[in-house]
Design a protein with these regions (language model features):
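Catalytic-core loop-and-flanking beta/alpha module that positions acidic residues
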Residues: 1-159
């Protein structure tokens, strides 16, 4: 099984701290409207009870076992609901389906990049490298800024 995680927002101070090396990293905005396998892109379900799959589930595999495992990949504790997460979940069967040519081409995701957002603390060298990399593309580059009036982030376009 392969899982890729995405969020509906790029303005969460907490997520920049957790997932972008304390605001030194970056966030990528994708446009998945033309994604071939978007039926596998689902919102995460935030719940207070754990979604249960027995530890010895391999002993109980049935034709529907794949669905149970797939479904389990879409659950997360309600504590994380601020993430507004979506997951692209592909099973081994999906990955070998002829429609996907043996496996999902990871590099093809580049075609869906709309923008790159640099963290508040991203270095100037990192900014230069990102701007150089996307110079001849339609990808927009932004730097996140902390609001002076409240606890929020705003994106300022730099390229």
């Amino acid at each position: 099984m392969r899982v890729a995680c995405f969020s509906e927002t790029n303005r969460s101070i907490l997520m920049w701290s957790h997932y972008a090396h304390n605001h030194q990293g970056f966030c990528i905005e994708y446009d998945f409207s033309q994604l071939e396998y978007k039926q596998h892109l689902k919102p995460v379900r935030y719940v207070s009870e754990r979604h249960y799959i027995p530890g010895d589930f391999a002993d109980h595999i049935s034709p529907n076992a794949g669905n149970a495992i797939y479904e389990a990949a879409l659950y997360k504790s309600a504590e994380w609901s601020y993430e507004k997460e979506w997951r692209l979940v592909m099973s081994k069967i999906d990955l070998t389906h002829p429609e996907y040519s043996e496996r999902i081409p990871v590099m093809a995701v580049n075609a869906f990049i709309r923008a790159v957002y640099l963290g508040v603390k991203a270095s100037k060298d990192f900014e230069k490298a990102i701007c150089t990399h996307y110079k001849e593309t339609p990808v927009k580059i932004y730097r996140m800024k902390l609001s002076a009036s409240n606890y929020s982030l705003q994106a300022e376009q730099i390229q």
